[in-house]
Amino acid sequence: MQSLPETNHLIIKLRSVADTLKEADLRARFFLQLLVRLNPMNLTAKILLALLLLQCKPGLTQEFTIPAISDLPRIDRQSPRPATAILRNSAFILKLKHHAPLGSGYVIITDHTDDPYMAALRELAEYRQAKIIHVADLGKIYQQDVLSAVRKQLIDLKPQYVAIAPRLESYRENMLLGMWELLSTLDDDKYLDAYPGVLLASDAKSFAALIQRSIKFESIAQKQLKPLAISQVPSNQESRSLQKAGILRNVFSSFGIQTPTIAIYTPAADDAPHLSGPQTWNIQMKNKGDFVKKFEPAAATALADASLVIMHGHGSPGMSCSVDIDGILTRSNNQIVLSGSCFAAAPLKTDFPKMTRIPGGYAVTPRQSFSTRYIDRGATVFFGHMRLSSGFPHLYPVLEKWMQGKSVGESYQQLINSLMDMRGLGPGKFVVQEVTPEQRGVPQNILLYVIIGDPALVPLQPLEKINKR
């Protein structure tokens, strides 16, 4: 009989090998369950069999399929739990929840005091006929005395739209969660009672330029819409982000719109699936940790021409889907950008425990966020997440609302309200007061999506499918 130390050593070895493979956590659990079921075999034989199966990566590669958008389940709190394969591939869509705003006004909440920032906000306020509420520090908006004072003003002003304009140093997780506490307590129900949007850039010049673009922005018409998809393929086994590019191509094709696609393959994805068709570029990275800082001319031209950029894949501060912030074009038509990667809208300072490793195996280092770099280089709207993003299931319903002609703020409000419902969060449960260093998961992480943009701005004119014309 196998001794306990030897057994433990083999189990540890199995887990070690499993951890070297992408998505190995799911397969390791499967094989550990398999060991228990193989009763006639001794433990050593079971371990060796599982190790052999784990190493046979080609045989374990997920089948690459591109389902129709209509075949993806729409999920809310009452929905049955989807199959494991659907969850693993993020092949589902969050159902969004409509909730009427408190009124029809427009309010700007800010802690800026410097003249260049305030001049830009006053110009936006004049354009939107808005009122400006000033607080000393938006990073502490969740404090009860501040909440009470601002809440009273909002109830009196009855806003439809609320633009949140924090200083860069007050842009943090509890600032955003504190805003959800504020906007969900303007009446008796638990939902956000206004359409929010975040106004943020890395400096006063970029901030003023963002406001100018927002004021001058005209919703993009179907004939002028030029989407582009960027997907990261991190391994031969993990192709779900590439799948989302295929889904998006089919969605836009139904509107008579072509979607150029850039797929970026890490060194571990040397035998992964590829999309075919015109205007498709496959970039194979040579070294682990390399990110794209310059695109080949043809891909760069297509990217520069795109008015809508949609990205799927892993990310870290300063990187999204294997594209480095230095790879963001200095001159482009990229007006609307959605990133489903983690940390795409990361704050410079965090209210949460520092993370050292994140999905994809990337290190978390302090860098300018992908979102503010894109805003600095001319984007008008950016969708991202402060920390760990769920990607497509939460990104696509926002994009879908924009394709229906909804505003930045309405889509943002519906996303947060639906996520509140999904996770059972509400007033009194938003702000994270204490988190232990060893705590792995923070439930409020799900509410840390950020949409930078004027909340009243409508990104797209409603799209009409070509078979309905």
Question: For the regions a protein language model found, what residue spans apply to each?
Answer:
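Short hydrophobic targeting helices and cationic amphipathic motifs
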Residues: 9-10, 26, 31-32, 43
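Sec-dependent signal peptide recognition
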Residues: 42-49
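Intrinsic-disorder-associated, low-complexity terminal segments enriched in Asp/Asn/His/Tyr and depleted
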Residues: 8-9, 19, 25, 39
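Cysteine-dependent hydrolase recognition
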Residues: 62-469
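Hydrophobic h-region of N-terminal signal peptides that target proteins for export
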Residues: 49-58
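Basic polycationic patches enriched in arginine
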Residues: 15, 27-29, 37
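Short linear segments in intrinsically disordered or otherwise low-structure-confidence regions
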Residues: 2, 13-15, 19
